[in-house]
Amino acid sequence: MNKLYSLFLFLFIQLSIKYYNAKVTVDTVCKKGFLIQMSGHLECKCENDLVLVNEETCEEKVLKCDETTVNKPCGDFSKCIKIDGSPISYACKCNPGYDMVNNVCILNECKNVTCGNGKCILDTSNPVKTGVCSCNIGKVPNADDKNKCSKDGETKCSLKCLKENETCKAVDGIYKCDCKDGFIMDNESSTCTAFSVYNILNLSLIFVLFSVCFFIM
């Protein structure tokens, strides 16, 4: 029993150290985005059509690199740069510490890491920078398969879902704070409101009025 307890305590401490040393923590406020959790890390996800300029900040993405968009974000962890030459040209380049792989900027340490049902992250608990797999919720690294995300396993949600009528949910392989069952997000107030029969009737009434106005016109 003592050996089992010691092993559990060791794993708990290692996981705590990893989350503590990470740039994104449970207390991070994502600018124009929201916090998510996978098996081994936390990260910010951007709202629609925005991209990450750093671990905590999302901004609007430019669609083309030219003289008017130099230093503007053109993708996650990338920006437009000017290339001197004849003629002068412009390109989308990854931020320092990242490399372009299949048109996506990934950490230098992750170029040769394949995770499967997850993604490669920087192992912040290791003094030597290495890439490790953080898995989709429901999967964990498999020591018998080069630590790829090929093993079923559970990960406890550590997100602080503090808004009223909000809870932690597993959605598409990640944990995120979402409205409880029976509630829906009100985009104007950014709060979870009850999705009652009253709401449905209001929507139906709006649809009927719109249809009547359309046919009258």
UniProtKB/Swiss-Prot annotation:
Signal peptide per UniProt: 1-16
Propeptide residues according to the Swiss-Prot or TrEMBL record: 197-217
EGF-like domain residues: 30-59, 61-106, 106-150, 153-193
Native source organism of the sequence: Plasmodium reichenowi
InterPro entries: EGF-like_dom, Pvs25/Psv28_EGF
Keyword Repeat: yes
Organism lineage string: Eukaryota, Sar, Alveolata, Apicomplexa, Aconoidasida
Name under which the protein is recorded: 25 kDa ookinete surface antigen
GO CC annotation, single: plasma membrane
Keyword set includes Amino-acid biosynthesis: no
Keywords, alphabetical: Cell membrane, Disulfide bond, EGF-like domain, Glycoprotein, GPI-anchor, Lipoprotein, Malaria, Membrane, Repeat, Signal
Location in or out of the cell: Cell membrane
